[in-house]
Each structure stands twice: as C-alpha cells, then as structure tokens.
C-alpha cells in the first residue's frame, strides 16, 4: 500500500479533492502547473508555505492514481 503523508482529503475542503497537508492547494493544481511548464522552484516561490517534498509527493500521488485506473482515450482520426 502506498503511504502519502502529505496528501489529505476532506469533504469540507476543496470539494473533497486531494490537497496538500489540509491546505487549499490541490494535487491537481500542482500537477497542472508543472504540466504547463512551471518549475518546482517557481511554485515554491508562489506558495511559500509549501515544501519541495509537498510538490514531489503530489506528483507521486498523481502518478499512482493514474496507474490505478484505466481511462479510454479517443484517438484523433
């Protein structure tokens, strides 16, 4: 079993989405920013209450979730 100590889920916070340490920063936001080309250092500058390990664990969590379920993708014709 995977342990993600920095990832929390609370139905009362951000609609129950996975967040970083109970804060209003979602895993999806972190992954989206990195995917858009932002560096970890830039994220940490914008969110000084986050630690590098928070960002890395968010990426590991997202990768784990992606491996846990298959989603059919439509192929471009």
Question: Which positions does each model-derived feature cover?
Answer:
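Long, charge-rich, low-complexity alpha-helical segments
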Residues: 26-77
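N-terminal first-folded block
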Residues: 1-25
């Amino acid at each position: 079993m995977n342990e993600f100590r920095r990832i929390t889920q609370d139905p009362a916070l951000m609609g129950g989405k996975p967040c970083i340490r109970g804060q209003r920063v979602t895993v999806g936001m972190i992954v989206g920013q990195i995917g858009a080309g932002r560096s970890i250092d830039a994220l940490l500058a914008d969110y000084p209450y986050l630690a590098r390990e928070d960002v890395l664990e968010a990426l590991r969590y997202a990768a784990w979730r992606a491996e846990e379920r298959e989603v059919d993708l439509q192929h471009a014709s």
